[in-house]
């Protein structure tokens, strides 16, 4: 992947706890049941193209890789999770020492992707794969949506110039930045 330089947006921030609480409770369950080292394989796919267009465009790899490279539970994260009362100390210690050992395969950025076909595969300890799920879904779902729309607009323009005005309608500054980056 190529490096990113951006002064507007800190794309290297730690998104480890930007997850559904469910992912944490499932991971804690895996640890409690002795599945910490059990290897799992998760495939990400989509069921249908929302606009009936037949295909989507793969996008989001760079953001996903940057986020995965930054995964680390801080003491502040651990203390917050402890305060919920939902997790035992064994799980919190696991998170404190968390290191990703997964293999991740994905369709190349910019390629057409189709319903019911894997676009990202994650293989590794089940507990680690589970902790990646929300990050994977939120990153690729948004980026593929925007890339697909941009692809369709550019194809319809048939070589005429196209201008991007997405920031004013984007769902937050991240969406505006990453949409414009496509």
Enumerate the predicted regions with their spans.
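An N-terminal, globular interaction/scaffold subdomain
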Residues: 69-71, 106-109, 113
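Buried, small/hydrophobic-residue-enriched core segments of structured protein domains
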Residues: 6-39, 48-50, 86, 92-101, ...
């Amino acid at each position: 992947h190529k490096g990113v330089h951006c002064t507007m947006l800190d794309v290297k921030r730690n998104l480890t706890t930007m997850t559904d609480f469910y992912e944490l409770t499932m991971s804690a369950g895996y640890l409690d049941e002795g599945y910490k080292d059990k290897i799992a394989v998760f495939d990400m796919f989509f069921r249908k193209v929302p606009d009936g267009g037949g295909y989507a465009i793969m996008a989001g790899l760079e953001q996903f890789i940057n986020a995965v490279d930054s995964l680390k539970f801080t003491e502040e994260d651990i203390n917050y999770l402890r305060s919920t009362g939902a997790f035992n100390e064994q799980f919190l210690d696991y998170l404190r020492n968390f290191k990703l050992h997964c293999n991740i395969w994905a369709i190349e950025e910019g390629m057409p992707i189709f319903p019911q076909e894997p676009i990202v595969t994650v293989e590794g300890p089940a507990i680690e794969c589970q902790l990646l799920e929300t990050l994977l879904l939120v990153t690729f779902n948004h980026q593929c949506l925007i890339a697909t729309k941009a692809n369709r607009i550019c194809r319809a323009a048939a070589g005429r110039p196209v201008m991007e005005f997405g920031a004013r309608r984007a769902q937050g500054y991240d969406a505006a930045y990453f949409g414009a980056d496509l």
